[in-house]
Structure formats: C-alpha cells, structure tokens
C-alpha cells in the first residue's frame, strides 16, 4: 500500500542514520552492507551535487557497545564534507530528533521534505521517520537504502526472520504517510 508507483517528488534534505563502522563493516556488519554503503554513498553524492542539506546522525552507544563513543566502531563510515556545511549530530536515543538539534537544523534551512537512509530499519530509522512525520515533514524512505540484522529464531515463537524481511516490515509499519521509494536512485534532491 505505501510503495510509490512512480518516483517521489524531490526532497531538500538527506538524513543519514547511524552509518557507523560497527554496523557496516567487519563481523558486526548488517547483511549486504557493501550494497548499502554504495547506495547511501550515491544518495549522499547526489544530495551534495544538488545543494540539498546533508545531516549524518551518529549514535552514542552505551559503554561496551559496538558504537561506544570514541571507539573504532563509533566512527562514521562515510565521509563528511564539512566544507559544504554538512551537519553531524550525535544522539543517544533511537529517535534522531530526541535531545538533538535536528528539528532546528531542518527548520532553519527551510526544509519541508526529507529522505532517510541508514540503520537499523526497525529502530533508529523508524523512530526518526515517525517523529519527522509527527513534525509535518514530508518523508521519503528509499527501500534499498536502509538495513538491519536478521532476527534469530526464538523457540516457541518463530523461525529466524531474514534482515530484508525485517526492513520491509519496518517500512510497512510506518503507514501511508511515508513515501517508500522502490529504489534510492529514484529520489531526487533540490536546494531547500
């Protein structure tokens, strides 16, 4: 129901969620991380070329977590171009708006429509999307630009659930207000 049959209208900002080394490289990488990195990297390049606002959210994990601050896993895996005014916002909750300047940054730039990408589909991507919708932003979620882990089997509950299914269920659960683009390459960008 919420998959768009045609490419969505252009957006003015790209929010890159938790593309940190712990989640996209090495043993802890989400399944198909190389494809995700290519897809998100392409989105970032196209956002930069168009003059759209680019914000990277960086999760501050708990002590001992793979994304604990100032550890190799915490580092953003894709480069930030500070010379273009790109913004990095640290967060400690799933929701990228909670106790961050994200709403202020978007409003001050004049953004009304944004695209989200990154990890984890059912956690930080979903929570950030829900708040963006609640704040009346138009939200586009490219189906191939977010990811998560497989859910392991739970005896008496379910078999294992593949990561791709978890991601699809997460985007479906966001309802009809979100625009799900089938492919990230269909998302267009414009200046705010």
What are the residue ranges of the model-derived segments?
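Active-site loop/turn elements of alpha/beta-hydrolase fold enzymes
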Residues: 59-60, 144
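Glutamine-centric residue-chemistry signal
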Residues: 20, 56-58
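Short acidic, Gly/Ser-rich segments with clustered Asp/Glu that frequently serve as metal-coordination loops
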Residues: 21-26
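N-terminal nucleotide-binding beta1-loop-alpha1 segment
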Residues: 14-19
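A short alpha/beta connector and helix-capping loop motif
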Residues: 28-56
């Amino acid at each position: 129901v919420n998959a768009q049959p045609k490419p969505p209208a252009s957006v003015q900002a790209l929010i890159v969620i938790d593309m940190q080394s712990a989640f996209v490289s090495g043993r802890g990488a989400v399944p198909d991380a190389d494809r995700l990195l290519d897809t998100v990297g392409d989105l970032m390049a196209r956002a930069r070329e168009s003059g759209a606002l680019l914000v990277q959210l960086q999760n501050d994990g708990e002590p001992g977590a793979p994304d604990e601050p100032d550890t190799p896993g915490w580092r953003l895996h894709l480069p930030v171009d500070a010379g273009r005014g790109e913004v990095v916002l640290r967060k400690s909750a799933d929701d990228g708006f909670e106790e961050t300047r994200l709403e202020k940054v978007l409003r001050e730039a004049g953004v009304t429509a944004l695209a989200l990408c990154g990890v984890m589909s059912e956690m930080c991507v979903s929570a950030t999307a829900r708040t963006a919708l609640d704040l009346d932003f138009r939200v586009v979620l490219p189906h191939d630009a977010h990811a998560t882990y497989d859910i392991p089997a739970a005896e008496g509950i379910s078999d294992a659930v593949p990561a791709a299914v978890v991601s699809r269920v997460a985007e479906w659960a966001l309802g009809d207000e979100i625009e799900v683009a089938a492919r990230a390459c269909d998302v267009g960008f414009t200046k705010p």
